[in-house]
Amino acid sequence: MPFTSINYGTCTLPEGRLITKALLETSIKGIGKLHKTSIFPCGIFQCMKGINRKEGEPNYDLFKLALKSTAQRLYPNYANCDWSGNKGYDKNDPKTLFSTMGCRTANGYDINGFGQLKDGRGNICPVTIIMPTLAMETKERNTNSLNQAVLIDEFMNFLDIKIHEAKDMLLERFEWICSQNPKSAKFMYENNVMVGYDGKDIRSALKHGTLAIGQIGLAETLQILIGCNHTTPNGMALAKRIEQLFRTRCDEFKQEYKLNFGVYFTPAENLCYTSMQKFKDKYGIIPNVSDKDFFTNSMHVPVWEKVTPFEKIDIESQLTGYSNAGCITYVELEESIKNNLEALESIVNYAMDKDVPYFAVNVPNDMCSNCGYTDEINNNCPMCGCSNIRRLRRVTGYLTGDYKSAFNKGKQQEVEMRVKHA
């Protein structure tokens, strides 16, 4: 299935408003005779002060319609056009407004001439650092030291080495990709899809894309090093130190190599499970670290933490600013939110005001495959009694079919452990 995303919500022209309204109304209606929730395209509503955030603004009615769609269909997600990390964009040029590619991937400032232009650029190659493994390797090398500060310093040095190794890997992959014949992606290069292409060397286009250094398992890493995660002050302090190292190095690499290195909060749909299995094989079961089948996605608050939507936003918003290649914050809500859109609006606006660049809401989306009844369903449909239930859940920034069949074992467990934030 093609991975597609559509960013919309800021065009105030009659034609643009009609298209946005049609997209949202179609999302709410669903597809086919059973009115299924659409998996793709991933809808992303671009929130922007003066355009759609408050009553009286020209597209506020479309924002309200977007909230209705989110409550019923999980889409759209919300991109923050006022995000501080997108400084220098042109409010009159929609191609520079903050947008994402669905799962969370985003284009930062292009060092090679296009600035905050988003269209025609993409994530050329990513690599992910499995931080809990680094933390355990560091701890094993320091078994004779009881000094926590020494352990942390050793970990930071080790992480720094791995960030440099990640950079070298990306440079090698970038060179290999640039060696490809334009015919390997003929549509992309011959239809002006990729900006900057000179018609000869694909490097002319690819140099405007992102080389992303990602991460997984911040929460478990903190647990290994200091015995708590970033829901605590001590955990957050170390989390910021870790993320600052990622950002500092990526900024340095960007200047040195004149390529768009960026910090990426990796989706890790499969890696969350496979990396944990290898970790368990080597280190066994460690409470609050490997007593489950997955590592926590990037810098997220662990799914089992009992926090409110506002608390989760407060915590993660302190870290999202370190990422310039893509991140997401989402909250888990009860199905009943569809009857309280004012509450949903307050949550989305809170995330935007907290400078979260990309925000999503998870609500149960179960559908009877026999009669089409859609709601949170236990074992059998309350309308017709059928047990063939399609259960959609968000895997990263997008939906991926019934999570019982589309997700791996680790991601299935993560979904089942998710605590409702409201």
Task: Please tell me what each predicted stretch does.
Residues 383-422:
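Long, charge-rich boundary regions
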